Amino acid sequence: MSNSKTVHLYTDGSCLGNPGPGGYGAVLEYGKHHKELSQGYRLTTNNRMEMLATIAGLRELKRSCHVILTTDSQYVKQGVEQWMHRWKQNGWRTSARKAVKNKDLWQQLDEEVNRHKVEWKWIKGHSGHKQNERCDELARDAATREPMLEDEGFGGE
């Protein structure tokens, strides 16, 4: 992957109520190219929206890339960097042998992350970071407008 292009991906999720209506926002930047993604869901959680922002952004990349992924979600960053490998080894169960919450999205995230070389960066949310603020706007807007999708994997937890 030494010849792969470097893409910057910024992500954020929003949920009004948690659970409640939610949305995600993602911004992809490569050279002079800039693309924004967003989608709203009728009933979901903030964590699911953070995950879907990351999945949607990575899916947008048609070939393997070096991705510098900036998120304000410790849940997503730590999940991928620290927990997911063990969950996968344990049949998507926690160390306490309980089913992993949001397993459907962790499995999709695992697939997408493995297609790329991802460098994770965490930033504090609402700290004035330009792209994170834009992702937040996209996510909040998506959570309040049609068309909204059903979050098929949300089980009401």
Swiss-Prot record:
Looking at the record, the residues that make up the RNase H type-1 domain are 3-144
InterPro entries in alphabetical order: RNase_H, RNaseH-like_sf, RNaseH_domain, RNaseH_sf, RNaseHI
Residues reported to bind Mg(2+) 1: D12, E50, D72
**Required cofactor names:** Mg(2+)
Q: How is the cofactor bound?
A: Binds 1 Mg(2+) ion per subunit. May bind a second metal ion at a regulatory site, or after substrate binding.
Catalysed reaction, written as an equation: Endonucleolytic cleavage to 5'-phosphomonoester
Please explain the role this protein plays, according to its UniProt record.
Answer: Endonuclease that specifically degrades the RNA of RNA-DNA hybrids.
Main subcellular localisation: cytoplasm
Q: What is the name listed in the Swiss-Prot or TrEMBL entry for this protein?
A: Ribonuclease H
Asked whether the keyword Endoplasmic reticulum is assigned, the reply is no
Q: What are the record keywords, sorted?
A: Cytoplasm, Endonuclease, Hydrolase, Magnesium, Metal-binding, Nuclease
Gene Ontology BP, a term: DNA replication, removal of RNA primer
Say which species the protein is native to: Idiomarina loihiensis (strain ATCC BAA-735 / DSM 15497 / L2-TR)
Q: What phylogenetic lineage does the species belong to?
A: Bacteria, Pseudomonadati, Pseudomonadota, Gammaproteobacteria, Alteromonadales
Query: Belongs to which family?
Result: Belongs to the RNase H family.
Q: Which GO terms describe its cellular component?
A: cytoplasm
Checking NCBIfam families in the record gives: PRK00203.1 (NF001236)
